[in-house]
């Protein structure tokens, strides 16, 4: 049995930055550090940070006075940001991915101009809630669509004054279909100058597609609440290959690979490499003899943490 390893896979720049913010806050200020929502959607990462003193909350009211609070990588609404700023907090750090912030700015700009905005995204996802929460113009409107059917059913105030944005972790193929429907339904709608789906999501989907073409079965390392990990598993399934979204190596049943000659392995953008290595070890225990890493797009993007958390930061008195 041979293992093919997708490339790129695992942590993206936004996830790496968010985790680093929590880790450095713990190092500098000590526990407890409060984090609004899971900083990234990965059970291993969240449990590790929790053991080190991070406390994950959903409501700002759960944070005591004089505490340190961090917003997760998914971003928050303007209302939550204002609520946090009104509290007596020692420090407030924003771990929102800069590429999510870019979409927030697009929505805020539309709100200021009075344009109605349509977001392509999954209802209930924290990134979607945060992005929708950037719009506050009562004269306009903010709408959420998930599918072409949603587009055809949508009613807006002014079809000539529309723009759209997308969640950053969507399926590239599915989103393209929704955008096509938007352009047909609303010919004058304006989209972003550059696709809102982030580079990491796009690259990992391209790598997963190649993996699915060559493997007999595909494993995606990632948690069930991870949007981008789910999209990778769906992509492999659409290619006609059995695919499994797994939190850890222990999730793998040997029967899943009993008839496979080639096993594909990839990981969502919030899954650490240690989990991938554990999966490889388990597959080797099941008889895998060779691991081949596929070629793929090189990623060298780095997002800096806030200056107060940088190792070279000095307080000016």
Swiss-Prot record:
Molecular function terms from GO: 4 iron, 4 sulfur cluster binding; 4-hydroxy-3-methylbut-2-enyl diphosphate reductase activity; metal ion binding
Cofactor note: Binds 1 [4Fe-4S] cluster per subunit.
Binding annotation for [4Fe-4S] cluster: 12, 97, 198
Residues involved in isopentenyl diphosphate binding: 41, 74, 125, 226-228, 270
Pathway: Isoprenoid biosynthesis; dimethylallyl diphosphate biosynthesis; dimethylallyl diphosphate from (2E)-4-hydroxy-3-methylbutenyl diphosphate: step 1/1; Isoprenoid biosynthesis; isopentenyl diphosphate biosynthesis via DXP pathway; isopentenyl diphosphate from 1-deoxy-D-xylulose 5-phosphate: step 6/6
GO-annotated biological processes: dimethylallyl diphosphate biosynthetic process; isopentenyl diphosphate biosynthetic process, methylerythritol 4-phosphate pathway; terpenoid biosynthetic process
Required co-factors: [4Fe-4S] cluster
Binding site for dimethylallyl diphosphate: 41, 74, 125, 226-228, 270
EC number per UniProt: 1.17.7.4
Catalytic reactions of this protein: isopentenyl diphosphate + 2 oxidized [2Fe-2S]-[ferredoxin] + H2O = (2E)-4-hydroxy-3-methylbut-2-enyl diphosphate + 2 reduced [2Fe-2S]-[ferredoxin] + 2 H(+); dimethylallyl diphosphate + 2 oxidized [2Fe-2S]-[ferredoxin] + H2O = (2E)-4-hydroxy-3-methylbut-2-enyl diphosphate + 2 reduced [2Fe-2S]-[ferredoxin] + 2 H(+)
Annotated residues for binding of (2E)-4-hydroxy-3-methylbut-2-enyl diphosphate: 41, 74, 125, 168, 226-228, 270
Active site: 127 (proton donor)
Record keywords, A-Z: 4Fe-4S, Iron, Iron-sulfur, Isoprene biosynthesis, Metal-binding, Oxidoreductase
InterPro entries named among the record's database cross-references: LytB/IspH
Oligomeric form and interacting partners: Homodimer.
Similarity section: Belongs to the IspH family.
Record function comment: Catalyzes the conversion of 1-hydroxy-2-methyl-2-(E)-butenyl 4-diphosphate (HMBPP) into a mixture of isopentenyl diphosphate (IPP) and dimethylallyl diphosphate (DMAPP). Acts in the terminal step of the DOXP/MEP pathway for isoprenoid precursor biosynthesis.
Name recorded for this polypeptide: 4-hydroxy-3-methylbut-2-enyl diphosphate reductase
Originating organism: Proteus mirabilis (strain HI4320)
Phylogenetic placement of the source organism: Bacteria, Pseudomonadati, Pseudomonadota, Gammaproteobacteria, Enterobacterales
């Amino acid at each position: 049995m041979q293992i093919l390893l997708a490339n790129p896979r695992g942590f993206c720049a936004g996830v790496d930055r968010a985790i680093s913010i929590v880790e450095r806050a713990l190092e500098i200020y000590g526990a407890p550090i409060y984090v609004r929502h899971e900083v990234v959607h990965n059970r291993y990462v969240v449990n590790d940070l929790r053991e080190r003193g991070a406390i994950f909350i959903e409501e700002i009211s759960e944070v005591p006075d004089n505490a340190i609070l961090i917003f997760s990588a998914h971003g928050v609404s303007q209302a939550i940001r204002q609520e946090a700023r009104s509290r007596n907090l020692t420090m407030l750090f924003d771990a929102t991915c800069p590429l999510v912030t870019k979409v927030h700015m697009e929505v805020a700009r539309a709100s200021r101009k009075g344009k109605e905005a349509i977001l392509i995204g999954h209802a209930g996802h924290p990134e979607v809630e945060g992005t929708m929460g950037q719009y506050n113009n009562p004269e306009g409107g903010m709408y959420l669509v998930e599918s072409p059917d949603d587009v055809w059913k949508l009613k807006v105030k002014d079809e000539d004054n529309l723009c759209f944005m997308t969640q950053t972790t969507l399926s590239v193929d599915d989103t393209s279909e929704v955008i096509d429907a938007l352009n047909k339904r609303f010919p004058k709608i304006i989209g972003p100058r550059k696709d809102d789906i982030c580079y990491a999501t796009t690259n990992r989907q391209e790598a997963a597609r190649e993996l699915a073409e060559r493997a007999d079965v595909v494993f995606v390392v990632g948690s069930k609440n991870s949007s981008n990990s789910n999209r990778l598993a769906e992509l492999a399934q659409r290619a006609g290959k059995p695919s499994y979204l797994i939190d850890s190596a222990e999730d793998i049943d040997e029967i899943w690979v009993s008839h496979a000659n080639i096993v594909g392995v990839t990981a969502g953008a919030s899954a650490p490499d240690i989990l991938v290595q554990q999966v490889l070890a388990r597959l080797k225990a099941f008889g895998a003899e060779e691991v081949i890493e596929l070629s793929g797009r090189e990623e060298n993007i780095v997002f800096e943490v806030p200056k107060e958390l940088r190792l070279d930061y000095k307080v000016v008195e």
